[in-house]
Amino acid sequence: MPASKQELLKDTNGECSLNPNKYTPVIEVVSPDSSSFTRLKKEMYISDDYEAELRDLIKQKKAVVLAVEAGGRYVGRVTLRHDWGGETSIVEKDFPGLPQINALEIDENYRRQGLATMLVTAAENEARRQGFSMIGLGVEISNEPAKKLYEKLGYSYQQVGGSDTYDFLFGKPNPQVYKLQLMTKSLRTEANHG
């Protein structure tokens, strides 16, 4: 059973990081069999292929979809996955069992308001709750805003297969190759080290 909404919103200090002066975003775990998932697919433009992949992973208990709602609609989403998929299985060779933050997306009208940080924190909390001590993500080498965000949140760059980058193929029927960098973060808190 995934964590409660309040548990997902707490940062590493156990504080809830909402800004009550704007609106109150709500982060929730979205089940693929719910009407909420249908809404999320439409409002956050999830492709049929990715939907099928998510449904399969969730049935196998290898993924959790988290979404943020504000103003009565979904404005952001992220997936916590326990796999790295076919082309990126090179990551699993060097970092076996490392869960990943995947498909972080915020509606362009809601960016730079802390929602990405909230979703990443929620995914980290869910991974921690599931017993993981580290988490990773792949970031496109040219995506400077995302790299800065992840660095600010404590992620560090790792080599994969002896290289600073790895290839990720995306899209069907003619996949495009993206160069990604692996970033990881320890999920252990100071209290866990003692």
What are these regions (language model features)?
Residues 103, 107-121, 130, 141-148, ...:
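Conserved glycine-rich acetyl-CoA-binding loop
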Residues 81, 138, 161:
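Conserved residues at the C-terminal ends of beta-strands
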Residues 54-69, 131-147:
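Generic detector of contiguous secondary-structure segments
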Residues 11-13, 19-108, 120-122, 126, ...:
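Acetyl-CoA-dependent GNAT
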Residues 77, 158-160:
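Residue-level detector of high-confidence beta-strand sites
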Residues 7-15, 19-23, 133, 140-147, ...:
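C-terminal "cap" of GNAT-fold acetyltransferases
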